[in-house]
From Swiss-Prot:
HAMAP family with a match to the protein in the record: UPF0745
InterPro entries: YcgL-like_sf (IPR038068), YcgL_dom (IPR027354)
Gene3D superfamilies reported in the protein's UniProt record: YcgL domain (3.10.510.20)
Pfam families for the chain: YcgL
Protein name: YcgL domain-containing protein Psyc_0800
Residue ranges the record marks as coiled coil: none
Ranges of residues in domain YcgL: 1-95
Amino acid sequence: MHCDIYKFLKHDDMYIYIARPDYPNDTDEIKDWLGVLPKDFRAGLGRSKFVMHLDLATTPALARVDKEEVLAKLASQGYFVQLPPQDVMRRQAELHARESQDSIYNT
């Protein structure tokens, strides 16, 4: 299974894998590959940036996620969301809380 991987400027360390089951026969026309994402979810992501194209059949393992889980989600829904590690999410939440608190008390 081939897929494209995108990241989003609003969400550090979150990557979305988009299935490309017909690759390379699907390159004749320009297509909105992110169109498989639910509209509300996609709207909250902000601007996307293409990271890379990946052939999962020739990739032995993935760094942060289970390859079989990625393949299953790509086959069933057409995309897979790789969330940041818990420590990154915790740091982002703490930073956001501090910034919110600072804006309340420094006005």
